[in-house]
From Swiss-Prot:
CDD domains: AdoMet_MTases. Disulfide bonds: none annotated. The gene is pcm. PANTHER family: PROTEIN-L-ISOASPARTATE O-METHYLTRANSFERASE, PROTEIN-L-ISOASPARTATE(D-ASPARTATE) O-METHYLTRANSFERASE. It catalyses: [protein]-L-isoaspartate + S-adenosyl-L-methionine = [protein]-L-isoaspartate alpha-methyl ester + S-adenosyl-L-homocysteine. It holds the Pfam family PCMT. Transmembrane segments: none annotated. InterPro entries: PCMT, SAM-dependent_MTases_sf. This is Protein-L-isoaspartate O-methyltransferase. GO terms for molecular function: protein-L-isoaspartate (D-aspartate) O-methyltransferase activity.
Length: 210
């Protein structure tokens, strides 16, 4: 169930659910999601659903990946920071769109698996094993920042690493109630917020695990 027909069906579903950016849809059609999950779940790779990847983490639902990617692509970013590498799928989507991707993962085993997938696909992504809530100051500022786990509030440390004209997209809230929030730093340096969608993400946790 990794055929082009199955991928096309997923893309059509995403289009029906409101995803309009054809660059995003084309990239989701091309990037092999089945390589980012356990072989036992391969038959479900192109369903529009989140799937477990171990360590209490998930690979996000394709619609969420598309929605977040579409939101950051609206500001035409060149350099993006991702907080929470997970399986590496979202990173691969961003890199395949031609972005310079920096990604941070707190769980060492997940990051090692993701790096192996990046090498397998020939994708250049800079990655770091660290607490994502601190960002990656050495390469800041970023045109876009994408957070793939939910914190109770937007994290000031990450906002500070956002370039003028840049956009941060992140789930915000508690385990029982979350919303996808879009923050944009305007040309005059002020910050605008917009709530995009109700969502459900795993929690953004502090510290590091091997």
């Amino acid at each position: 169930m990794t055929s082009q027909r199955v991928r096309d069906r997923l893309v059509e579903r995403l289009r029906e659910c409101g995803i309009q950016d054809e660059r995003v849809l084309s990239t989701i059609r091309i990037v092999p999601r089945h390589l980012f999950i356990d072989e036992a779940l391969a038959l479900r790779a192109y369903e529009d659903t989140a799937l477990p990847i171990g360590h209490g983490q998930t690979i996000s639902q394709p619609w969420i990946v598309a929605r977040m990617t579409e939101a950051v692509m609206q500001v035409a970013p060149k350099k993006i920071l991702e907080i929470g590498t997970g399986s590496g799928y979202q990173s691969a989507i961003l890199a395949s769109l031609g972005l310079e991707v920096y990604t941070i993962e707190r769980i060492g085993k997940l990051l090692r698996q993701a790096r192996k997938r990046f090498r397998q696909l020939g994708i250049k992504i800079r990655s770091k094993h660290d607490d994502g809530s601190t960002g990656w100051t050495e390469h800041a500022p970023y045109n876009a920042i994408l957070v793939t786990a939910a914190a109770p509030t937007l994290i000031d440390t990450l906002i500070e690493q956002l370039a003028i004209g840049g956009r941060l997209v992140a789930p915000v809230g508690t385990a029982s109630e979350q919303a996808l929030v879009q923050l944009t730093r305007t040309i005059d340096g002020s910050i605008t917020h917009e709530i995009l969608e109700p969502v459900t993400f795993v929690s953004l946790l502090p510290g590091m695990l091997d």
